[in-house]
Amino acid sequence: MSHEEKNIVVLVEDTDAFGRLNWRVFCRYCELGEAGLLKDLGFDQMYFYERYGISFPRRLARFEYLSQVFPTDTVDFKTEVKRVGNTSLTLSHIFHKRSKKAEKPLLTAKAEVVIVAYDEKNHRKMPLPKELVERIREIRPKAFDV
């Protein structure tokens, strides 16, 4: 199970002083991927908060940057569930850039983000919602084998 977005325009305001895509924008792309993945699983991004008071803050985010991205490029990315734990999900994000100079998309970055089910009322982590786990198991059972 994965969520993909393609041909995202790189805005000039999303670049750093040297004209490269700012690292913070990759974080935003990860959040877009998380929201898209939830939607693809059948859940609005606010569903678990509104229904159960559960949010999904990030516990860990690891990025590897492999190629610079500029405003003349577009970005494609794919987000997938890599691992399902008791209280957390590990998500994999793969980013490619499309450039006028290159024939094929070029791998530009990889990220791994761990999000944790968090009980907003009691201010502590909690088991992942059962319906989320069941839906992921239906679509991506290998995420439970890790």
Residue ranges: model-predicted function:
Residues 1-59, 118-146:
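Hot-dog-fold acyl-thioester-processing enzymes
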Residues 16, 20-27, 31-35, 64, ...:
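Residue-level signal for functionally critical sites in structured catalytic/ligand-binding pockets
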Residues 1-6, 69-74, 82-146:
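HotDog/MaoC-like acyl-thioester-processing domains
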